[in-house]
Amino acid sequence: MSTLEPEKRRQHEDKSNEIIDSPIFLNKISALPESENVHCLLLKQLIGSPQLKQTWQFNFCVDLNFLLENMHASVFPTVDVRITHGYDSKSDSLARLTAQMNHCPVNVKLYSVYVPMWGTHHSKIMVNFFKDDSCQIVIHTANLVEPDWIGMSQAIFKTPLLYPKANDSLSTSSVPEYGNPSKIRKHEGSLDIKDDRNCDIIDVDSAFENFKHKSDTRSSDDLGVIGRQFQQDFLAYLKNYRHTYELIEKLKMYDFSAIRAIFIGSVPGKFEGEEESSWGLGKLKKILKMLEKDSKKDEKTKFEESDICISQCSSMGSFGPKQEYIAELTDGFGCQRGNWKFLFPTVKEVQQSMLGWQSGSSIHFNILGKTAASQVETLKKGKNLCKWVAMKAGRQRVAPHIKTYMRFSNDGELLRWVLVTSANLSKPAWGTLEGHKAKSRSTRGLRIRSYEAGVLLYPKLFEESQRAPCIMTPTYKTNTPNLDEKRREFYGKRVIGVRMCWDFPPVEYEDKDEIWSPVINRTDKDWLGYVWPPNW
């Protein structure tokens, strides 16, 4: 949804354009200048409202003390905190988290999740409920630990505030006027909405955007189909837990029609037949194929063979003895091997990052693995492997924990689609096909081992009847697209920004560049004066 001031939006419309700010946010890094933190978010802006009533946190690593530090102290006596973590039941990490829970001043429930071998509970999701009965879903890339939020690059997608459907009520208590859906509908077109929460948490302009949708010539059923599909897919994901019945029943009562995103999730299991395209790489492949087919109807927006697909993440698994998984991945991403680039930091980029070698503890690749060296060599020879370059994005020294997958036009001006997700480049996260070979004894299906969550965005999601056609473009150091002279061809269109955390075009590894792997000791000190691993 657009976060532009109404006056600013009108100015752009006078130029026959409509601008929509990036639905993707980056995390705010306090050590960076303000010019590189424009539109960036703190964890406190997501869970720090004095109106927070209940929060469901789904994550891998959790520091409960850090979580509470980012909540408003006034909610401690009443807030209900539910945490689904990724720790093994016998791990020291879970023991520490349990000890924190036993000594904290808040009502906290912890939930463990079974995952098969090689799998993890890796999703990063928040479902926040507020005292006015509003709700917000946040899908992001950060663990709930301080280093992830203060020193690593992360991405955040947050839905608009969601409210109960007109015929549903979550409580019999009086609801403030700004939180009552029926009251909001009576004020269509008005921006005089009051809210006693932090203005950083609530975008009044989101309400403005919703009012605009209500006045569109299409029926509300047409406008809400994307959001209802998101709701259906998100609830299907939640059904894979044993402890989320209460949450599912609650979310069924909410109106998701304002959401413009596709939920892409992974859950453990082997998925056969139609279910193969319900999760992970199978679902992404199905949607992207439909997108590419649909794009051929419009010469100005169709996918081109020269397009560049980019995968960027903070962990790389094994691609197999002959790197056969690369073919599965590129097929899923809908691109040719020669047009696929993979961004992963070098040793030098980790060493010079804001947290120094410590950043590398969150960036995983086992170079000592049986086929790891040949895998890197294959990626280099294919000109697929690229460095972490983020000068234009303002994140060069903020090492990546973010995971992004995108398809660019060759000149980098247009984005065909964007995926922000917790999923790294691995078989457990995305899934791998079983039983598809001629002599295979097992049935065909997609095998996934981890829990992952992400959102897919593409221009058509933002289209509305009797409005300009939509295009999507990268933005740097801001969420707002910049229509300068070189983008005059954008005039007359609805332009959606996508906040970039790294630079286009990607820069390939040189022969001297060494891929980062935390299993290798480093005697060279980082800029903070530490070796790796540190002697703490």
Curated annotation (Swiss-Prot):
InterPro entries reported in the protein's UniProt record: Tdp1
Q: Keyword check for DNA damage, yes or no.
A: yes
Q: What is the superkingdom listed in this entry's lineage?
A: Eukaryota
Among the GO molecular function terms of this UniProt record, one is:
3'-tyrosyl-DNA phosphodiesterase activity
User: Per its UniProt record, what Pfam families does this chain match?
Assistant: Tyr-DNA_phospho (PF06087)
Q: Where do the annotations place substrate binding? A: K124, K403
Region Interaction with DNA: list its residue ranges. Answer: 315-318
- Coiled-coil blocks: none
SUPFAM superfamilies to which the protein is assigned, alphabetical: Phospholipase D/nuclease
Please indicate which residues carry the site annotation Interaction with DNA: S426
| GO cellular component term of the entry, any | nucleus
Q: Which GO terms describe its biological process?
A: base-excision repair; DNA repair; DNA topological change
| CDD domains in the cross-refs | PLDc_yTdp1_1
Q: Where located?
A: Nucleus
E.C. no: 3.1.4.-
User: What are the alphabetically sorted keywords of the record?
Assistant: DNA damage, DNA repair, Exonuclease, Hydrolase, Nuclease, Nucleus, Repeat
Q: Which residues act catalytically here?
A: H122, H401
Query: Among its keywords, does the record have DNA damage?
Result: yes
- Name the major location: nucleus
UniProt function note = DNA repair enzyme that can remove a variety of covalent adducts from DNA through hydrolysis of a 3'-phosphodiester bond, giving rise to DNA with a free 3' phosphate. Catalyzes the hydrolysis of dead-end complexes between DNA and the topoisomerase I active site tyrosine residue. Hydrolyzes 3'-phosphoglycolates on protruding 3' ends on DNA double-strand breaks due to DNA damage by radiation and free radicals. Acts on blunt-ended double-strand DNA breaks and on single-stranded DNA.
Which family, according to UniProt?
Belongs to the tyrosyl-DNA phosphodiesterase family.
**Protein name (Swiss-Prot/TrEMBL):** Probable tyrosyl-DNA phosphodiesterase
Q: What is the lineage of its organism?
A: Eukaryota, Fungi, Dikarya, Ascomycota, Taphrinomycotina
